[in-house]
Structures are given as structure tokens and as C-alpha cells.
Amino acid sequence: MTSTDGIYIEGKRIDTGDCSGPRSARNVLLHPDVDAAVFETARGGVLREGLGFDLCDVAVITNIGIGDHLGLNFITTVDELAVVKRVIVENVAPEGSAVLNAADPVVVAMAQHCPGQIIFFARDRMNPVLATHRAQGKRVVHVERDAIVCGEGRKKHRFPLANIPLTRNGAIGFQVENAMAAIATGWALGISWEVIERALAGFVNDAQTAPGRFNVFDYQGATLIADYGHNPDAIQALVDGIANMPARRRSVVISGAGDRRDDDIRQQTEILGDAFDDVILYQDACQRGRADGEVIALLRDGLANARRTRQIDAITGEFLAIDTALARLQPGDLCLILIDQVEEALAHIAARIAEAR
């Protein structure tokens, strides 16, 4: 498997850093022990070198939303970004499938470019795209009461959300969508329901298994969540998910990627300002072309009309910002830490938790 965290083979990491490009994919395919591969396929690598493979059995597009990385590499609109992202859909084998989010119109439009079959997924079973696909007897995945349901014609299979720890009994909406996409992928590959069920039940998104992906910790009776979310869509998904988690007081630690557009940086704190009591801003280790303090100023601008936030602090340094947030926590509080240096920040958090025991 390749990802922005590295290359993993048989559960062991053989390379670190951003390995979501075609060179890493080719390295995996050339490995003598590999029979099947999963590739995170990033925009940048596709633009530079294309794909690291000819055809894929399954292509998965979870969402495009309002877009990310716009303004870079001459990609300025969501539609232009979609043209890049859909390359994996265009290169599905004729007997393969594309797993597409029926709730994202830009993703839905990719279906016409797929040489294989389409499996649509969406939380809302009444989604028009999903309903039409289901009425045609084609494969769909959706949520029905307390379960994820796979449907094809009159056939159905249910996966109780209570048996999928990733979703916290269905409370974390974006994790439900991730689980649906994973289930649809397994279904497309012909993997048995039993194997899919065991995989879902056994997967825990902790700092070791999925670093920086909604990692939850207990800190002296308060809840910490560490996540690498760094665009408005990700921030909104996190806010929606955390809304279902009880908390006495809510705080957030955030920086911004300097290579994003000004509006994209501002919009992140516009969202957070309506959901958190305290906001701690910090400057990324790498400013990505911005002057010192420029990103912090944009983040402050986004909080100008905050409906909930009452305390705003700007801290120099990610770890000092984390320590500042931890020092303020009381039992029953919740703190979202939007990390930049993923491995280092998670190690720092783990050390602080160990010290507090």
C-alpha cells in the first residue's frame, strides 16, 4: 500500500514520507512479495508523471467538495481538479468498478468516463442518484437506520454500525462514508461478506494504524482528537463529527498551509469559529512561500465574525501550541488538534499523555 505516510508491505513500512505518486506505486508493483496493491493517488503525482499502473480493478473517489490545492499547477477550478482526479476512473479495467460518492455531483459526473461498472454510495438512501442506480438493479451502498446496507436488485446485506468501531456507532459521519467506500471496494473485488465484516470490526484508527486520521486520546478526563485535516471540506467534516461527541468546553489548535488560497485559509477558521470556544493558532514549520505571520493573520481574519469563539491565541511553534491547549484542559473538555508534522506531533502528544498518568 502507498500513501502520504509511506509505503507498507505486509504491514511493515519500507519507506516514509509522501509516497502517493506513481514512482512509489511502481516500486510496490515490482516487489516480489506483492499480489495485490492499494494506491493513494495524489493530484501532484498525476500531473507530474501520470499513473504508476496501466489499469486498476477498482477506483475509489470519496469526494471532491469545494476542492483543495486550487491555484496550484494551473488548476484553478473544481472542474479542472476533477479532470485530474478522474484519471483513475478512466483507467478502470473493463471488468472492474469505480466506487463513487453519489452525494458529490462532481464525483457523480465521473461515472460516464468509467469503462467498467459503477457502485454508488451515500449515507442518504433517498439520494436521487443512488435511488436511480438502485432502481436499475445496480449496486449501491447506503445507511439504513443503524446499519450500512449493500443493495443490488432485491438482494441486501447489512453491516451494523455498532460492529464498525471506526464510526463510533455511526456518530462520525465522514467515517461512515469511509466505511461505505471500503465495503463497496471489497464487494467490487468479490471479497466475502464475512471477511469484510472481520476487517471492519478489527480496524481501529489509532495513531499507529492511521496516524493523523481522527486519532482519539484521553488526557486527564478530557478528550483529545488529532487530525491532519487542512482544507475547508475536511474541517467541516471534523466539526460535524465532533458535534456528536459531548463536551463541557471545546478548543482547537490550528495552522494553515501557506500554498493554499487566502480564502481557503480564512474559511477554515470561519467554520471553527462557530464550533469552538477557544482557538489557538500556530505557524507551520514550513510557510510554503508565505511571509512570517501571514497565515496567522488570515486565520485571524476568518475568526472576525465568530459566533462561538471567545478566546484566540497565536503561538509560535506547533508543540508549544499543543502544550498551551493541554494546560487549559479540564475533565469533560474536548480539544481538536490539527497537526502539521504528523509523526512528531503524535509522539509529542503521546509523551504528554504518558507524563500525565
Q: Where would I find each of the regions flagged by the language model?
A:
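Short beta-strand segments
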Residues: S3, E40, V60-T62, N101, ...
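A structural preference for short, hydrophobic beta-strand core positions in alpha/beta folds
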Residues: M1, F120, I312-T316
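Adenine nucleotide phosphate-binding catalytic loops in nucleotide-utilizing enzymes
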Residues: F74-A82, R86, G96, P115-Q236
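Flexible active-site lid/hinge loop adjacent to a nucleotide/diphosphate
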Residues: I9-F120, R125-V129, N163-T167, P232, ...
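ATP-dependent carboxylate-amine ligase
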Residues: N169-I172, A184-E194, R198-R357
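Residue-level signal for inorganic ion chemistry
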Residues: T2, E40, V99, I118, ...
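Short beta-strand-centered segment that lines the nucleotide-binding/catalytic pocket of NTP-utilizing
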Residues: M1-E10
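Short, ordered loop/turn segments at secondary-structure junctions
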Residues: T4-D5, I64, R123, D284-C286, ...
